[in-house]
From Swiss-Prot:
Keywords: Cell membrane, Glycoprotein, GPI-anchor, Lipoprotein, Membrane, Signal, Synapse. One of its GO terms (biological process) is presynaptic modulation of chemical synaptic transmission. Its main location: membrane. GO terms for cellular component: AMPA glutamate receptor complex; extracellular region; extracellular space; glutamatergic synapse; plasma membrane; presynapse; side of membrane. Belongs to the neuritin family. It is found in: Cell membrane; Synapse. It comes from the Eukaryota. It comes from Homo sapiens. Coiled coil: none annotated. Residues 117-142 form a propeptide. Residues 1-27 form the signal peptide. It is a lipid-anchor; GPI-anchor. This is Neuritin. Promotes neurite outgrowth and especially branching of neuritic processes in primary hippocampal and cortical cells.
Amino acid sequence: MGLKLNGRYISLILAVQIAYLVQAVRAAGKCDAVFKGFSDCLLKLGDSMANYPQGLDDKTNIKTVCTYWEDFHSCTVTALTDCQEGAKDMWDKLRKESKNLNIQGSLFELCGSGNGAAGSLLPAFPVLLVSLSAALATWLSF
């Protein structure tokens, strides 16, 4: 005996599959621009650091770099706003976890407490950015 499918059942199954596919594409479409937005944020941060004003005192140096750092995080949250639900929360979680790494001279340490020297920030900066972007890319691929 076997299962007999007439045209109605096949059409219903196809309609459900197409509806699921359309919903998945719509959800994925919301995140289409997230990598472009995130890369734009990184480029903007890089440009700010490259055009960093010379000859400032230490306090002004730290304040300037921390402004760039906070602008980067604001830009990233904006890029994630239209993405799938929870992406902004995941970014905030990654940010908090990165603060807990306690890397001496990191931007989290430097900008969170207002202490430190501008010279100690440069070695940790690229490592931190790569770690954050790799974690974000890994999370968004699932």
